[in-house]
Structure formats: C-alpha cells, structure tokens
C-alpha cells in the first residue's frame, strides 16, 4: 500500500544532475504530511532498525528520515556528513556516485558507546554511499545490522555489493 502511494508522489527527472541519470525526487513526499508520517511508521517497523544500538543517517536527505525514526524508536542518531561539515576528530572516506565522487565524515567520538548500527538513506542506487559508511564503521570494529532506504533502484544491483540486510519501502 505504501509503495503505490510513494510511487504516485515521487517525481522522476531525466538527465539530472548529469546526462544519462534518471533522478527520483522524493521532495513531494514532504508536502504530504500523512504520507510522510506513514512512511516513517513503515520504516520504523524494520527489524534492522529495531535491532541496532544507534542509527547513522546520511547527508542530506537521509537526515529527513533518520531524525524522525531515531526519535520514534528512542535510538541515538549519528550523522554521516559531507566533507568539511563536522568539527573535532572525524573518520572520513571517499566513494563513487553514479555521477561523480564524494566524501563522508562521522565524528569519531559519536561511535564510542555503540556496537551495532543501522544506516538510513533516501535512495539505494549503486551502493557507494552506504558502503562508504560501512567502511568507516568496520574500520573501527563496529557492526552493521543493515540499511533502510526509501527507494531501491533494482537495475543498479547495489544489493549484490552489500553484505548485510537491506530494507526498502519502494523498489524501482
């Protein structure tokens, strides 16, 4: 049921942000508070999230889901930010996107109290972003219970590159 509602709300744009990319815009979800709330409720049911000690949410659209879900589940929220956005000692890693390269950072001290993490993001495309967070966590002997995303782009086969459970509310 939620999948069909999301499919109706999401808009797709060809050749954005680069020629050859089909961009799925989730912005219309936020103009429909009932749908946004239903999506948060649905994602929060995931065993992946419920079995974690903390949630890591990915800059920037992942924050829109991670913050709501962490409050709903009373789980700590850790932000994976783009390079240059976090003060203090950080862990950083670079990854490839469908359309370029990017880096993510996590404040080192934010990981100290926790062992098992769930990752939240808006879209699972190539798996590069989520794998970047995984490498940051595993380099510090942390576990990943899995990842939760709003949309999974099946044609890009990211799931094959990830060695942990994935929960997606909509597959395209």
From Swiss-Prot:
Signal peptide: none annotated. GO terms for molecular function: adenine binding; adenine phosphoribosyltransferase activity; AMP binding. The lineage of its organism: Bacteria, Bacillati, Cyanobacteriota, Cyanophyceae, Synechococcales. Its main location: cytoplasm. The gene is apt. Its EC number is 2.4.2.7. It comes from Prochlorococcus marinus (strain SARG / CCMP1375 / SS120). This is Adenine phosphoribosyltransferase. PANTHER family: ADENINE PHOSPHORIBOSYLTRANSFERASE. SUPFAM superfamilies: PRTase-like.
